[in-house]
């Protein structure tokens, strides 16, 4: 069953506007059990205020808290999705006299396994704060500053427990062998910050229309994780990491990266028929070595509204507009994991026993790195035509494109196995593609 409860309020006047909302959602999972559940609580608020004629401030807040539980198949359970077993083996308990023991045990049916299954718990909390400041120092000129902060924390814990049942061959089994029951907990933290500031100028002089925009962008992202597991709980009713008597394992992880960019755009139109747009980005990413972090990515597009020319007046009765366009652009791709340009060594426990029954740590060979490691560049050429006809009822768009990716990061060389590590990533691969796309749309109305 799914339940949603929401409440909202909004209001304001000429200078201040606001809205607030809250919600509660409950949902049962597909399995018929109280162990499979999801619940989410959320609240949001938005305020926009015209402080004066030249300054407007906006604030947006969002908080979400979600809890999820679900049964987990562990050890010898053999799953609770095998519904075919229901027709062959009875629900309830198998008499101990048949099993050769004193106690009656539940049979290994999906229903029993689901009823006895241990439960995993996950809590996720998300906080988002964003602000927007708009300044209007002069007519046709605006300056906008934006900031966004995202925070996501996830915490989970699980205990495998131990219970006894009768398997399909009428043998008494434990779900987890003695001393192999385990308790684990995991915590992850994600943080994201983004700052944008840009300026727009929009003006028209007679037949000339001019727009200009320039700005700065900076983003940062960090990820932190912690995972711990211990076997053999001394107090199963209150599982904990400190209460484990068996093997313990702990792992953690951390990564971060930042992006810094400058960008600009220039638009010019003459009589709204001859169109020109110039774009440029200068992007830097911490995912690349210090001397190769920045790249410049320009683009250009032109358009001609042919249907607005005088020599096309003969087609006005059926042709509403026709536009020819062409563009060339390049963008950078940095969709890789951080630290790929660093040579690292991994430390892990050995499976080899030495004197005094002690294990030693093993350090892997350092990875190879390449001096060629920077942005991938995606270049695209596009030719297109837009047609509107028959009183805007028929619309057609046709595009032909050619795309090329230069300097794709790939394993550029073959490394002998005796080296003990993999080949380094290099900007050594290229990829080309081309194609066309046609889109036809008909819009009409029949009757009233």
What are these regions (language model features)?
Residues 40-42:
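N-terminal hydrophobic alpha-helical segments
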Residues 31-35, 287-290:
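Short, surface-exposed loop/turn segments at secondary-structure junctions
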Residues 35-37, 73-75, 315-320:
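Short, glycine-/polar-rich solvent-exposed loops and beta-turns at beta-strand/coil boundaries
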Residues 46-55, 60-65, 103-160, 171-448:
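Extracellular/periplasmic, surface-exposed regions of secreted and cell-surface proteins
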Residues 1-34, 73-74, 116, 134-136, ...:
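Residues embedded in well-ordered regular secondary structure
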Residues 1-6, 76-113:
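Acidic, glycine-rich flexible loop segments
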Residues 167-168:
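Intrinsically disordered, compositionally biased low-complexity regions
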